[in-house]
Structure formats: structure tokens, C-alpha cells
């Protein structure tokens, strides 16, 4: 039954590249087969509950611009928001959604009320999932918005806050399992510091390590089959966050014995804030064996903060999905649109148009990436670039067959005198441009 929020808009359909209908897909056809798999199954699109249905359209210089009938802190409003959300998922035809606990339930007076409210809305969500077939990609806890978390959650100097946060995560994992969620995400929005003058770095890192171990231990104790994910971000809201980027997260996981238990959820905008490209973070996660999922969006390259816009750069998406596919594709992860409307985009249909454009952009990127893989457009030159490592002496240097002295003897005996070879960067850039 329609809520009426989206008026008479019908389910969004694929109309092909020639269509000029803003409420139609031009490139995303869920049933298109790409590399032997349906496009929908490759991309595994999800809608972010927080930006789509919770964000009021404010900025540091002005307040709410969006008028939504569910912008009230009550269970009745939470259920209306859920009705609109699941109607939206069906209009778009997305298979998944994601949420924080605070996105979906009214705020209670204490932990017990928060838990009761969350359980009530989870029951409601379970019914909506059964009616629509839409599934939960991942759940998470908001451990950054409430003032109790102003000095962090797991890294807070107050053990009561640590306990409150741990208990909250426990209830959110329970909710995720109840809804058959395929992952559980931890984003340390305030797990960092504003100044070192009042920060004990070692203590806070040890607290964070113990917190994450508690999560993993609980996952195994209750038999949760999903993947635990950390979402890296370098700063904002804190000056310096402990989950700065993929490399930092991997070092943290190794230190606390969690590198085989936890993977990463990589956001495009966070990669840019960290001074990296999106594809760098994806390629590194693959190389380290911790790639899990992505939050898809776009940052304004001039602003210097997290703008969370919808993706519209096809060449960038092509390289991103190239690395997703090269790593074997998503297992339990997917493409979550962690993107929000601009504050002047106040019409209900703007929510659909933003997601349609993002989904089309990702579809174009996926198809270009798949074609590059089929043609070995990048893998063949890469293999040729490193071909020298296939000779016996080169293999011995890496597998322990040569000591440093033996390498020296080989260099002298064979008169090894390496000559530079072109990296052919311009050629490879031109190759990529042929596909996008």
C-alpha cells in the first residue's frame, strides 16, 4: 500500500541509453549478465537509511530544509518512516538497505528504553522485509551523535561510556542477526582525538582493541554468520581518527590479532579525505586480504570535507569496480549509497533521481571494468611488467633460496646490469579511456 509520499511515481524501470526520462534507468538493468553473473548480483545495491530518510538538510550555517512527515521522535513516526523507506526500496528495485540504530528508533531516556524501541522497530522491519523481499546488507550502532559520546565510545576516558557503547553494539548485532543482515559495521566517528594534550594514545588504542575483540567474541558466541567490517576515515568529526585508512586499520587489526576476523567497508569520500584515490584503498584491501564492502559516494574535491554526494564520475567508477572484480567481487558486501541530496533538493522525487543517477553511473563503471578484465587490457601489461620475476634466480630471492651473499655472487657471476624500462603510464591511461 502506497504511503502517498512519492505521489503517483511508478516503479523505476530500465529504458536504455537513449531514454531522457529522469525517472528511468539508462544503464542499470538488473538482469543484464556481466562476466556470467546478473548485474544486480554483482553490484548488490543498498540504500543508506540515515542520509535518505533521517538527514534534515542542514549545514553548519543553517538548519533543516527538508520537510518530512516522519521528522518526529515517536514510534508512530518511526513506523511511518519505515513504510516510506520500504516503498522507496521497491520503487528503486534495490535488494538491500543499511541502518544505524538511531536512524530507525526513537531516542529513549536510557539504555533500556533504547533497546525496547529498537526491538519494536526490528519486529516491524522483519515484517516489511517479508512483504517486500528487501534484505539488510548491514546494521550498525550510532556511537557518535549523542553528547555522551563526545569523547569517543570505545576510546572514552569514562568506563561507563565504554560499557554503554558495548551494550549498545550488542543490541545492534542482535538486531542485525534477527533481520538476517549479511554484515555488521563499526565506524569510529569519535574514536580519535581533538588534541594530544588530554589524550593517552596507548590506552585508547588498547581500549579500542579490546572493544573490537569483544565484538568478535560475541559474534562467534551467538553464531552470527555475517562479516564484521570497519569503515576507515581519517578525520571529521575528530581531528585525527584511529581508523585513518585501510593501511592503518590493517596495522591495528594485526596488533590486536584480528586480521583474520575483520574486513573493511571502504567509502569513496573517506579515501579522498585520507589523500588517496578510491581505487588505491580497494587495491590495498585486496592485497591485504581484508576487502569487504563499499560505501559509494563522491566528495567535492575543492571543499576539503565529507560532502557525501552521489557518484557521477564513470572513469573513477570503472577503476573502482575493476579492483572489486579483480579481487573476486563482493562476498557478503555490496554497494551502499552513503550519499545525500543537496540541501536545496527538497522534492521527494529528488531522492529517486539521485539514486537513479548513482546506480546508472555504477552500472556503466561495472560494464567498463568487466570489459577490461575480459580483454586483459590491464592485466596483460601488468603481467609483462613483472615477468622477470618468473626466472629461477628471481624466484629464489623471494622464496628464501638465496641469502644476501648468494644474491651478490649471482650479480657478479652473471654481470647483472639492469637497464630502465618504460612504465607506459600514458599508454595505459589511454587504454582505460577507450573503455569509459
Curated annotation (Swiss-Prot):
Location in or out of the cell: Cytoplasm
Catalytic residues (UniProt): 100, 103
Quaternary organization: Homotetramer.
Similarity remark: Belongs to the xylose isomerase family.
Gene Ontology biological process terms from the UniProt entry: D-xylose metabolic process
Residues holding Mg(2+) 1: 231, 267, 295, 338
GO cellular component, one term: cytoplasm
Alphabetized GO MF terms: magnesium ion binding; xylose isomerase activity
Cofactor list: Mg(2+)
EC numbers: 5.3.1.5
Top-level EC class as recorded in UniProt: isomerase
Gene that encodes the chain: xylA
Alphabetical UniProt keywords: Carbohydrate metabolism, Cytoplasm, Isomerase, Magnesium, Metal-binding, Xylose metabolism
Name of the protein: Xylose isomerase
Amino acid at each position: 500500500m502506497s504511503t502517498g509520499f512519492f505521489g503517483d511515481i511508478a516503479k523505476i524501470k530500465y529504458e536504455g541509453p537513449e531514454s531522457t526520462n529522469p525517472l528511468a534507468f539508462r544503464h542499470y538493468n538488473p538482469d543484464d549478465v556481466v562476466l556470467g553473473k546478473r548485474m544486480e548480483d554483482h553490484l548488490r545495491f543498498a540504500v543508506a537509511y540515515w542520509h535518505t530518510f533521517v538527514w534534515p538538510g542542514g549545514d553548519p550555517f543553517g538548519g533543516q530544509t527538508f520537510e518530512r512527515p516522519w521528522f518526529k521522535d515517536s514510534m508512530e513516526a518511526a513506523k511511518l518512516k519505515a513504510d516510506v523507506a520500504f516503498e522507496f526500496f521497491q520503487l528503486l528495485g534495490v535488494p538491500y538497505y543499511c541502518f544505524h540504530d538511531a536512524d530507525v528508533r526513537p531516542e529513549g531516556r536510557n539504555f533500556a528504553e533504547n533497546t525496547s524501541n529498537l526491538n519494536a522497530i526490528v519486529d516491524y522491519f522483519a515484517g516489511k522485509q517479508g512483504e517486500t523481499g528487501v534484505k539488510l546488507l548491514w546494521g550498525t550502532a550510532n556511537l557518535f551523535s549523542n553528547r555522551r559520546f563526545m569523547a569517543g565510545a570505545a576510546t572514552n576516558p569514562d568506563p561507563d561510556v565504554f560499557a554503554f557503547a558495548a551494550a549498545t553494539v550488542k543490541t545492534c548485532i542482535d538486531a542485525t542477526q534477527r533481520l538476517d543482515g549479511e554484515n555488521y559495521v563499526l565506524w569510529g566517528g569519535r574514536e580519535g582525538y581533538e588534541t594530544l594534550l588530554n589524550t593517552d594514545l596507548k590506552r585508547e588504542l588498547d581500549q579500542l582493541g579490546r572493544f573490537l575483540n569483544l565484538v568478535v567474541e560475541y559474534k562467534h558466541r551467538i553464531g552470527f554468520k555475517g562479516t564484521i567490517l570497519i569503515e576507515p576515515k581519517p578525520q571529521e568529526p575528530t581531528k585525527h581518527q584511529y581508523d585513518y585508512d585501510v593501511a592503518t586499520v590493517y596495522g591495528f587489526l594485526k596488533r590486536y590479532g584480528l586480521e583474520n576476523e575483520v574486513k573493511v567497508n571502504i567509502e569513496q569520500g573517506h579515501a579522498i579525505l585520507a589523500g588517496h584515490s578510491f581505487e588505491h584503498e580497494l587495491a590495498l584491501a585486496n592485497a591485504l586480504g581484508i576487502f569487504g564492502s563499499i560505501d559509494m559516494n563522491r566528495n567535492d574535491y575543492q571543499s576539503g570535507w565529507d560532502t557525501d554526494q552521489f557518484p557521477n564520475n564513470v572513469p573513477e567508477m570503472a577503476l573502482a569496480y575493476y579492483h572489486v572484480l579483480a579481487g573476486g567481487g563482493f562476498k557478503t558486501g555490496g554497494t551502499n549509497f552513503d550519499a545525500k541530496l543537496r540541501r536545496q533538493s527538497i522534492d521527494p522525487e529528488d531522492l529517486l533521481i539521485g539514486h537513479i543517477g548513482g546506480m546508472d553511473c555504477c552500472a556503466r563503471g561495472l560494464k567498463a571494468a568487466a570489459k577490461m578484465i575480459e580483454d586483459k587490457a590491464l592485466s596483460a601489461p601488468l603481467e609483462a611488467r613483472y615477468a622477470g620475476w618468473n626466472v629461477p634466480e628471481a624466484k629464489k630471492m623471494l622464496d628464501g633460496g638465496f641469502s644476501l651473499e648468494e644474491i651478490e655472487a649471482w650479480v657478479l657471476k652473471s654481470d647483472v646490469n639492469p637497464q630502465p624500462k618504460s612504465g607506459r603510464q600514458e599508454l595505459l591511461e589511454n587504454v582505460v579511456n577507450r573503455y569509459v
